[in-house]
């Protein structure tokens, strides 16, 4: 889903109401012949233009899949502990995106942690728990995040 001048970095929302509303006009497909996201996806989760097999998607596996990381798809995520935005990163429309100015969406301290700091979370889970306060990352659950951090560290270069 793309917005001209913004790209694909935005939140979706819905409003539930009982009003009769006219539907918006269908948006133009701005992708054209571009396959950058399809080509870049490490798990081939984008199976054709505008079709995602969520069961292959690293974001789904690391956030939503309750059997992860016990399932047999472990090598697909390699050094990813939570989520993935590769498809977003390679989208040419995102060169127009601007960093969000909302303080609640600012990167947390842990974004710049090195391997030793991540390893510390394995012996001291409270370290990451404090970083997750009021974060969407809580959705995955602390136990799952710790398991994924452990897994990601095994694949992450020093």
Residue ranges and their predicted role:
Residues 1-110:
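Catalytic cores of enzyme domains
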Residues 68-158:
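Alpha-helical scaffold domains
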């Amino acid at each position: 889903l793309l917005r001209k001048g913004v790209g694909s970095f935005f939140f979706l929302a819905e409003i539930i109401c009982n009003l009769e509303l006219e539907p918006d006009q269908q948006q133009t497909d701005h992708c054209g012949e571009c396959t950058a996201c399809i080509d870049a996806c490490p798990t081939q989760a984008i199976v054709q233009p505008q079709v995602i097999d969520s069961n292959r998607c690293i974001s789904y596996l690391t956030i939503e899949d309750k059997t992860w990381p016990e399932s047999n798809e472990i090598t697909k995520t390699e050094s990813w502990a939570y989520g993935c935005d590769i498809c977003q990163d390679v989208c040419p429309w995102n060169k127009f995106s601007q960093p969000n100015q909302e303080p609640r969406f600012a990167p947390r301290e842990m974004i710049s942690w090195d391997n030793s700091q991540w390893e510390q979370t394995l012996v001291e889970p409270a370290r990451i728990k404090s970083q997750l306060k009021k974060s969407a990352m809580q959705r995955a659950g602390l136990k799952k995040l710790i398991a994924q951090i452990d897994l990601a560290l095994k694949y992450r270069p020093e």
